[in-house]
Design a protein with these regions (language model features):
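Helical hinge/lid and interdomain linker segments adjacent to catalytic or ligand-binding clefts
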Residues: 1-57, 154
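Short amphipathic alpha-helical segments and helix-helix/interface helices
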Residues: 26-30, 108, 147, 176
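Cysteine-dependent hydrolase recognition
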Residues: 33, 72-76, 183
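A short, polar/proline- and glycine-enriched secondary-structure boundary/capping micro-motif
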Residues: 52, 169-172
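Acidic, Ser/Thr-rich peripheral helices and adjacent loops at domain boundaries
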Residues: 56-71
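Catalytic beta-strand/loop cores that center a nucleophilic Ser/Cys/Thr
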Residues: 71-170
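Short, hydrophobic alpha-helical segments
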Residues: 176-183
Length: 183
């Protein structure tokens, strides 16, 4: 068994979350974590987390597309000052805030979390009601989770709304490194 499975943004998850075997994929992923595996998922891999672990995170819902793969893809491109809410991450960074950059439209946004979910990073961010035709009405998402983690059985899941690609800065990279080594 693998120790960690990474589901990066852009993973082709349509078959896994909408196909005939979607419930089987979700059950297998959940069992993997319950038996001690870890999952790291980012941005567009959110539907996999939502299907396998629905009780830990609530997702923003788009007023235009309220279900399906576009439903929680509401974040606008922006750089924001985010609060590091986890004491361990805050101590490792030596600071209480970091700059988080989103360089693309329609990033996946969380709305809230269950009590058992650990929130590492929070911020207020701008969103838009995206459709297949582009952005629509703008809105503000106040104090939303950007990075979370939760235990399931013997394993752990970490989800982050931001990428670790071209728009990453040193603070974002350090947070992600700390979280991956925690898995």
């Amino acid at each position: 068994m693998y120790d960690i499975i990474f589901f990066n943004c852009g993973v082709n998850d349509a078959a896994a979350v909408t196909g005939a075997n979607a419930s089987t994929y979700a059950a297998n992923l959940r069992r993997y974590v319950e038996e001690g595996g870890s999952v790291y998922a980012s941005d567009y891999a959110a539907p996999l987390v939502e299907m396998a672990f629905p009780e830990f995170v609530s997702w923003q819902r788009n007023a235009v597309v309220n279900n399906g793969l576009l439903a929680s893809k509401v974040g606008k491109p922006q750089t924001i000052t985010a609060n590091v809410t986890d004491p361990g991450i805050r101590a490792a960074l030596g600071q209480q805030t970091i700059q988080v950059s989103f360089d693309l439209d329609a990033w996946v946004a969380m709305f809230g979390t269950a009590p058992a979910t650990r929130v590492y990073i929070r911020a207020t961010a701008e969103g838009a009601a995206y459709s297949l035709f582009g952005p629509g009405e703008n809105f503000t998402m106040n104090n939303i989770p950007l990075t979370v983690g939760f235990d399931v059985g013997q394993g752990r899941v970490v989800f982050t709304s931001f990428h670790q690609e071209r728009n990453i800065n040193p603070d974002m990279q350090q947070v992600l490194n700390l979280l991956v080594f925690e898995l």
